[in-house]
Amino acid sequence: MTDQVLLPTSADEAISQYGNGDGVTIVAGGTIVLPEIAAGRLVPTQALMLHRAGLDGVRSDGGRTVIGAMTPVQALTDHAVEILAQTARHIADAEVRRSATVGGNLCAPAAADAQRGDLGAPLIALGARVRSTGAGGERVEPVEDFLAGDRTGRLVLEIELDDVERRTSGDGLRRRHAHSYAIAAVVGAVRSDTGELRLAAAGVAPTAVRLRTVEQTRNAEDVLRDVRPVDDAVASAAYRSAILPKLVREALDRLERT
C-alpha cells in the first residue's frame, strides 16, 4: 500500500513535492504505473499524482511550440507537425491515447515483452528539448541526451521545439496484435533554414536513439553503429538488424526527393 499520495494543483507545487525524487513514484496518465501498482509489482512510498498540476496543453511561445508533459498523446494526433501527429496516431488505440501522456510516453521504460516510447524518435528528429526538474535542479537538454542519460530522479515538465520549416520522413513496422508496439521505426527531418539532417530510431532498443553516424555518412548500413537492436516478444534482434538499414535508406531517399 502507498504510504502517501501527493496531489499538487500547480506546476510549482508539483516541483516542490517532487523534490529530488527520492521515494517518489510519478503517476501521469497511469497507463503503465497503475497496472503495476494494482498487481502489487510496484509499491510506492509516495505517489505523485499529476493530473491536477497544470502541466498539460500545447502552446506557442516566442517561435517555439511547448508541449506540457501531461498533455494526452491523443492531443498530438492532429498536431501541425505531421510527423509528430503521424507517430501519435499509431500509439495504442484512442482510449489509451486519451489517458497516456507525452511525458509518460517519453519516459516509458521498456517492458519485458516490448520496447516503448515511440514519441522519442520524432522528437529527436525535430530537435526537441526536455525541461525537467529533480536531483540537481532544473535543466533543459536535447531529448536524445535526456533519454541516453540517467533519468532517475527527474520529473519532466515540458517539451519544446523550434517553429521552423522542415522536410520530414517517417516509417516503421509494427504488429497490430501486439498492442501496437513498434518492431522498428525511423524518423528523419531536415531543417529548411540550415539544411541540418537529424535521424532517430525507436522500437529497436530500450529508448529512442539518435542516428548520429548515419547523419554524417548518409550510409544506411551505418545505423548498426548507432544502435544495437534487442530481442523481445515483438521481434528478434536479428530481424530488427535486417530491416533497420532498409527503413533508414527509405527515410533518406524520401528526404532527398522532397
Label every model-predicted segment.
Residues M1-T258:
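C-terminal structural segment of proteins
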